[in-house]
Regions:
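A late C-terminal transmembrane helix in Major Facilitator Superfamily
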Residues: 123-158
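C-terminal ends and interior cores of transmembrane alpha-helices
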Residues: 79-92
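Extracytoplasmic gate region of multi-pass secondary transporters
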Residues: 4-60, 147
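Cytoplasmic membrane-interface "Motif A"-like loop-to-helix N-cap segments
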Residues: 66-77
Length: 201
């Protein structure tokens, strides 16, 4: 728990849960209905996200073995944030805009999991990856719970979901910056050369 990398991973995964299961999984259908989109149509778009999610997560797993996982997460959270910022306008444009959102957001939905698991293993070792990712995964569920309740409370207070979706988009952009700091040691310069080599090994 003293590890900065743990809190960066847990914090970014908290935002992942907040912006997916808690927000979109819970509130997309009611938000769509408020914009005149039938419930069955909105549910169908949410189901279509699951199909694109399968594709996106599979490709993400392949990429996580070949690319810098921090940069992958930066792209994923950045694109998710931009998608959420676009969502209020997609809802206003009715079906076509929401369909475009479903494609891009669906591809990104669980794409964050493979690089997060890989970074957890690289940071804490394969012997500890199970328990460490368990705690990081718990933060994901906590984020989902916060968003499920918080988005509903904001909707009841403000009368619509626009502020909620825009705020979640901005939070995802913050996460895109945070994940780039995973694995960076601020104390490297203060360590003697021999000690630094032992830490890096």
């Amino acid at each position: 728990l003293r590890s900065r990398d743990f809190w960066l991973l847990a914090g970014s995964f908290f935002i992942c849960g907040l912006s997916t299961n808690g927000l979109i999984g819970t509130h997309l259908i009611p938000a769509s209905m408020e914009h005149g989109i039938p419930e069955v149509t909105a549910a169908g778009l949410l189901a279509a996200m699951g199909v694109f999610d399968l594709v996106g997560t599979t490709v993400s797993g392949w990429l996580s073995d070949r690319w810098d996982n921090r940069r992958l997460l930066c792209w994923y959270y950045g694109l998710r944030g931009l998608s959420l910022l676009f969502l209020p306008y997609a809802l206003d444009s009715r079906f076509l805009g929401l369909a475009a959102f479903a494609v891009f957001y669906g591809l990104d939905w669980i794409a964050t999991v493979p690089p997060t698991v890989r970074l957890t293993a690289d940071t804490f070792g394969r012997e500890k990856v199970g328990i460490m990712f368990g705690w990081i995964g718990a933060s994901h569920q906590l984020g989902a719970a916060v968003a499920a309740f918080g988005a509903g409370a904001l909707r009841a207070s403000l009368g619509d979901y626009q502020v909620t979706f825009m705020s979640a988009g901005l939070v995802c952009l913050v996460a895109a910056g945070l994940v780039l700091r995973i694995g960076q040691r601020s104390s490297d310069r203060a360590l003697p050369a021999g000690r630094l080599e032992s830490v890096e090994s």
